[in-house]
Curated annotation (Swiss-Prot):
GO cellular component, one term: ribosome
S-S bonds: none
Its job: Binds to the 23S rRNA.
Binding site for Zn(2+): C6, C9, C32, C36
Matching CDD domains: Ribosomal_L24e_L24 (cd00472)
SMART domains, sorted: TRASH
Protein name as annotated: Large ribosomal subunit protein eL24
UniProt keywords, alphabetically: Metal-binding, Ribonucleoprotein, Ribosomal protein, RNA-binding, rRNA-binding, Zinc, Zinc-finger
Protein source organism: Archaeoglobus fulgidus (strain ATCC 49558 / DSM 4304 / JCM 9628 / NBRC 100126 / VC-16)
Gene Ontology molecular function: rRNA binding; structural constituent of ribosome; zinc ion binding
Subunit comment: Part of the 50S ribosomal subunit. Forms a cluster with proteins L3 and L14.
Keyword Metal-binding: yes
Zinc finger (C4-type): 6-36
Length: 58
């Protein structure tokens, strides 16, 4: 099984869970939850500015 990492928060995604989103230009994003998907695609937030992500910088 291939291990995947959430494109937004940086946490591991268990096999059989999560969602794969493919843009028209061919870029692929993996999301562990609807929360991550909505924050990235709809709200256009930066993971570096949210404390609950692994990419958070102080």
């Amino acid at each position: 099984m291939e291990k995947r990492v959430c494109s937004f928060c940086g946490y591991d995604i268990e096999p059989g869970t999560g969602k794969m989103y493919v843009r028209r230009d061919g870029r692929v994003f993996y999301f562990c939850s609807g929360k991550c998907e909505k924050n990235m695609l709809k709200l256009k937030r930066k993971p570096r500015k949210l404390k609950w992500t692994k990419h958070y910088s102080r």
